[in-house]
């Protein structure tokens, strides 16, 4: 598979995973109040947030030593993804209800979704860590 096709497949998988996870988040945040269309929109928003943060990481982190890639990947992306999923929780939550433990746990699950889908990136499929260009 060419790198361009691999990147496109990865982007689509990332979007699908984010949309599915946003559907779960909507069920937690707005029981009975939102469906698949909203999940697709929130999935697109989450994907775009990840792309923007990914470009920023690429610019700010710059070149890294290959021997430190795994450490750098987790040190950089763990807090970035906490911010990204917190933004999503703020966007999807029903503001008439208090913030719930379930929504906080949904954010934690979102971090896991983000990291697991990175395994399907072109770099991840080659056993490497992507830092700054993996669509967060």
Enumerate the language-model features and the residues they cover.
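Juxtamembrane/disordered regions of integral membrane proteins
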Residues: 1-136
